[in-house]
Amino acid sequence: ATMTLTDANFQQAIQGDKPVLVDFWAAWCGPCRMMAPVLEEFAEAHADKVTVAKLNVDENPETTSQFGIMSIPTLILFKGGRPVKQLIGYQPKEQLEAQLADVLQ
């Protein structure tokens, strides 16, 4: 399952020991809707290695502008509270796993 993030809980959520993959999305965004089931599957398959979380850009402008999100979906991987990888646009599951292989080892 994926976690829902907001401006209020964002900083706390990304501080943990486990890496957090954050999906910046919006309800009106077609590629974001395509991305949702991929992320659910990814989250279940790799729950022990990475936390998958979603942040609605329309409802959380502060965090969205803090990370300079220009196009969605944007996925950012955080480790120890710091962004270490950014993926922009729809990612099929195989591509997502290949991009994050170092985290999933």
From Swiss-Prot:
<keyword id="KW-1015">Disulfide bond</keyword>
<dbReference type="InterPro" id="IPR013766">
    <property type="entry name" value="Thioredoxin_domain"/>
</dbReference>
<dbReference type="GO" id="GO:0005829">
    <property type="term" value="C:cytosol"/>
</dbReference>
<protein>
    <recommendedName>
        <fullName>Thioredoxin</fullName>
    </recommendedName>
</protein>
<dbReference type="InterPro" id="IPR036249">
    <property type="entry name" value="Thioredoxin-like_sf"/>
</dbReference>
<dbReference type="InterPro" id="IPR005746">
    <property type="entry name" value="Thioredoxin"/>
</dbReference>
<feature type="disulfide bond" description="Redox-active">
    <location>
        <begin position="29"/>
        <end position="32"/>
    </location>
</feature>
<dbReference type="Pfam" id="PF00085">
    <property type="entry name" value="Thioredoxin"/>
</dbReference>
<keyword id="KW-0249">Electron transport</keyword>
<keyword id="KW-0676">Redox-active center</keyword>
<dbReference type="GO" id="GO:0045454">
    <property type="term" value="P:cell redox homeostasis"/>
</dbReference>
<feature type="domain" description="Thioredoxin">
    <location>
        <begin position="1"/>
        <end position="105"/>
    </location>
</feature>
<keyword id="KW-0813">Transport</keyword>
<dbReference type="GO" id="GO:0015035">
    <property type="term" value="F:protein-disulfide reductase activity"/>
</dbReference>
<comment type="function">
    <text>Participates in various redox reactions through the reversible oxidation of its active center dithiol to a disulfide and catalyzes dithiol-disulfide exchange reactions.</text>
</comment>
<comment type="similarity">
    <text>Belongs to the thioredoxin family.</text>
</comment>
<dbReference type="InterPro" id="IPR017937">
    <property type="entry name" value="Thioredoxin_CS"/>
</dbReference>
